[in-house]
């Protein structure tokens, strides 16, 4: 394998773009803290961090395999390794299988409940790339997939999925729909041309209102989580800071343009970090 091929594999796995990894990792780590009522055992942190990174790359590979014909028509994606011919579909499938096995080995160190949930997580990871063909809001499926680690974190530590896990899961789904709609704005014109469905296409000229609506719902659910878990004022301070980030982002993505939308999307990882820090503060 030469240097060019290694670079192509690196690009296929999206390791040069860590922001989506953080968007998955922060809610998962927050769930570990909530489930542990404090800092979790280091083994859980290692297993779930590896799992997030590996499954994010698996999702990217599946997405590129599914979209290889569509990506040729989109300026932002027509240089990807599969689309440009740097790697074959066979190469991608073998890498995907190998990484999935790595993730499965990690989950074998957890309890049976979590192992069973991992199959649901894999199903969602496979479903998302294909639902863009028939489902009007694929961002909902992405929200289910990206944040499923919340359920797995609670099941691994508590062997159950309590009410607070469901509240937090719903909050992160709303958050994901909002930030991925911003991301989809960058490709909306191309998606309209080639028939790909997205929330950015569905919401049309009301898209900014819907992004703000889902931002609001995520904040509301976080407040409900704080009340249910009897969190102190520091948690609500974090919610206020998140709301300010959402307002700041609004003035960025409303300008449209690929750069503005991608920057607004990327800034969302700070939301995840803030909530994680506020959760940790509750137990120190």
Swiss-Prot record:
Keywords recorded for this protein, A-Z: Cell inner membrane, Cell membrane, Magnesium, Membrane, Transferase, Transmembrane, Transmembrane helix, Ubiquinone biosynthesis
Entry's EC annotation: 2.5.1.39
GO molecular function term, any single one: 4-hydroxybenzoate polyprenyltransferase activity
Record GO biological process: ubiquinone biosynthetic process
Membrane topology, as annotated: Multi-pass membrane protein
Pathway membership: Cofactor biosynthesis; ubiquinone biosynthesis
Keyword Transmembrane helix applies: yes
Top EC group: transferase
Keyword check for Transmembrane helix: yes
InterPro entries in alphabetical order: HB_polyprenyltransferase-like, Prenyltransferase, UbiA_prenyltransferase, UbiA_prenylTrfase_CS, UbiA_sf
Reactions catalysed: all-trans-octaprenyl diphosphate + 4-hydroxybenzoate = 4-hydroxy-3-(all-trans-octaprenyl)benzoate + diphosphate
GO CC annotations, alphabetized: plasma membrane
Family, similarity comment: Belongs to the UbiA prenyltransferase family.
Its job: Catalyzes the prenylation of para-hydroxybenzoate (PHB) with an all-trans polyprenyl group. Mediates the second step in the final reaction sequence of ubiquinone-8 (UQ-8) biosynthesis, which is the condensation of the polyisoprenoid side chain with PHB, generating the first membrane-bound Q intermediate 3-octaprenyl-4-hydroxybenzoate.
The protein's name: 4-hydroxybenzoate octaprenyltransferase
Gene symbol of the encoding locus: ubiA
